[in-house]
């Protein structure tokens, strides 16, 4: 596994006592007693005013948290004291506001959901490639470059000449591999994601499928943007992030995008001028896919968020992680209904 990484603030980020540190972290490690860690970890986060969501599973830990630097340091130190959780890979960036409204520690079957049994990055994984060596690798004409992220993430930025698998969720990635990649034809495959975790599992999956030369970007896109100068970059656009910032630019500053809470796709200011855009309810991509029941529920949630903002309060309905979970549950419910027909 890669060692812990502390993402330095850019010159444009002036840190003060009120600056919020955003920390993305993960580690694949066997956690036999992960259920017992849930309550003490949640209590520790709450005690130091750290918000966000952490996922615990038998295969490890994953998530993004935010709060004062002292709080983040306290949580990381607490995790480091737990069996197997020392040297957690983490990256830090900074914001003037906390992008999360709640503190959550959830128990899961997987810390990143592929839905394939037996894939263990601790046993087999692709070759890590440092950000400084990434450009040379993906410039090799024999290398097939695959973006393992979801379609709404790729919409606003990707590496030059990368393949978009057109997946809505990471669960669809194995099916993409089965239909589009051939171990006898594609001798070199390179993959990347936001912070590195999906690539740990996707490269492990390809190795299990018999692909020999499999590479992935160590530390993900965020580490690449931190270390590779914009004058040398092969990254095009902005990088989607799973918090209230929606996206960051090459300087790791908050980008120019908002997000449709209905379909999760990023939106520009111009796109928000569409007649189909209703804040918190729909946009030009999904207006004809949102049911009346959903439209009514989304509108009420947005009304509650607006009322909370007027009172100077935060509302959990505006938390990106909460919205993602809501959409995922809706999809699962829909699939369950179709399966029962």
Swiss-Prot record:
Residues 306-341 are annotated as: Disordered. One of its GO terms (molecular function) is oxidoreductase activity, acting on paired donors, with incorporation or reduction of molecular oxygen. It catalyses: uridine(34) in tRNA + AH2 + O2 = 5-hydroxyuridine(34) in tRNA + A + H2O. It comes from the Bacteria. Disulfide bonds: none annotated. InterPro entries: Rhodanese-like_dom (IPR001763), Rhodanese-like_dom_sf (IPR036873), TrhO (IPR020936), TRHO_N (IPR040503). Signal peptide: none annotated. This is tRNA uridine(34) hydroxylase. It comes from Colwellia psychrerythraea (strain 34H / ATCC BAA-681) (Vibrio psychroerythus). The lineage of its organism: Bacteria, Pseudomonadati, Pseudomonadota, Gammaproteobacteria, Alteromonadales. The gene is trhO.
